[in-house]
């Protein structure tokens, strides 16, 4: 039994790219009808929804925007068909239209009305399950086909060609031959990236905790290994100072000063004043000089 798509095409006669496009289009239609797929808006609505107070039926989840834009996939089904299908399945509780402007100036109007739960959920769930299975099969086939493209893109050696993407990442990380910092660098450029994958070399859970003793010994090891030019070893310097302090050498005797009398006489009137003092003393005591210094003239 051949499976027919809504536009009349046969699933078995389609190329892998056409299968991927058709499955993504149908999956988008179902998700838009059920209000699934917008993870960021669901998280925001769970945290705080400023329009929840004005809603008639509390506890309802917002639907996906009716008009969706994809960078690589162009949908042939107009947005009016999606809106009509979603309106038939669900009854809107509160209408909300949002106008957004893109960096290139294009205006995008989306209908983010809050809708009620579906009455025919079992049929849609079954269709959603089938589409998910088809998407998984198509993606698995693309992974097999893209393994050769990845090896040709990065010019890998012959021993790494023909292996899967996960094995290639593990091998590059284990052997340390310049593996990229992020895993999405190995993903084919044509495949859309929904989010930034974490680094391959994840830190441990206890990365916030630090051992002070280990950090001290790490700094001490770095200090001992890296030294400034001309710097003395601290341990040798301390032992040298300690030896000098313990050494008790005999104190050297200071040279004694030899006193030499000074007989120098300054040329002044000391002799004349001494002579005058002696004459005065002789006159006071009535002592006649023994010899006159000059001869007496006859009168």
UniProtKB/Swiss-Prot annotation:
Name the UniProt record assigns to this protein: Centriolar and ciliogenesis-associated protein HYLS1
Disease / disorder: Hydrolethalus syndrome 1: A lethal syndrome characterized by polydactyly, central nervous system malformation, and hydrocephalus. The polydactyly is postaxial in the hands and preaxial in the feet. A highly characteristic hallux duplex is seen in almost no other situation. In half of the cases, a large atrioventricular communis defect of the heart is found. The pregnancy is characterized by hydramnios, which is often massive, and by preterm delivery.
Keywords carried by this UniProt record: Cell projection, Ciliopathy, Cilium biogenesis/degradation, Cytoplasm, Cytoskeleton, Disease variant, Phosphoprotein
Presence of the UniProt keyword Cytoplasm in the record: yes
Residues bearing PTM Phosphoserine: 179
Function: Plays a role in ciliogenesis.
Family: Belongs to the HYLS1 family.
InterPro entries in the cross-refs: Centriolar_ciliogenesis_assoc, HYLS1, HYLS1_C_dom
UniProt entry tagged with the keyword Phosphoprotein: yes
Compartment(s) of residence: Cytoplasm; Cell projection, Cilium; Cytoplasm, Cytoskeleton, Microtubule organizing center, Centrosome; Cytoplasm, Cytoskeleton, Microtubule organizing center, Centrosome, Centriole
GO biological-process terms attached to the record: cilium assembly
Record's GO cellular component terms: centriole; centrosome; cilium; cytoplasm; cytosol; non-motile cilium; nucleus; plasma membrane
């Amino acid at each position: 039994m051949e499976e027919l798509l809504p536009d009349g095409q046969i699933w078995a006669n389609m190329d892998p790219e056409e299968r991927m496009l058709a499955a993504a289009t149908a999956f988008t239609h179902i998700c838009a009808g059920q209000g699934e797929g917008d993870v960021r808006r669901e998280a925001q609505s769970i945290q705080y929804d400023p329009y929840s107070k004005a809603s008639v039926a509390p506890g309802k989840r917002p639907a996906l925007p009716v008009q969706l834009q994809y960078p690589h996939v162009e949908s042939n089904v107009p947005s009016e068909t999606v809106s009509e299908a979603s309106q038939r399945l669900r009854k809107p509780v509160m209408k909300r239209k949002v106008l957004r402007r893109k960096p290139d100036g294009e205006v995008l109007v989306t209908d983010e009305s809050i809708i009620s739960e579906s009455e025919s959920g079992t049929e849609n769930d079954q269709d959603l399950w089938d589409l998910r299975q088809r998407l998984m099969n198509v993606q698995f086939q693309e992974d097999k086909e893209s393994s050769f493209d990845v090896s040709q893109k990065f010019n890998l050696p012959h021993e790494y060609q023909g292996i899967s993407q996960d094995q290639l990442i593990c091998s590059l990380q284990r052997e340390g031959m310049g593996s990229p910092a992020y895993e999405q660098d190995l993903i084919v450029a044509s495949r859309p990236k929904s989010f930034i994958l974490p680094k391959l070399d994840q830190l441990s859970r206890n990365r916030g905790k630090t051992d002070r003793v280990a950090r001290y010994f790490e700094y001490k090891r770095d200090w001992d290994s890296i030294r400034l030019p001309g710097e003395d070893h601290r341990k040798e310097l301390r032992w040298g100072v300690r030896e000098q302090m313990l050494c008790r050498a005999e104190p050297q005797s200071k040279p004694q000063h030899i006193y030499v009398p000074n007989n120098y006489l300054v040329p002044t009137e000391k002799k004349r004043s001494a002579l005058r003092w002696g004459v005065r003393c002789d006159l006071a005591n009535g002592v006649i000089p023994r010899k006159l210094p000059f001869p007496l003239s006859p009168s």
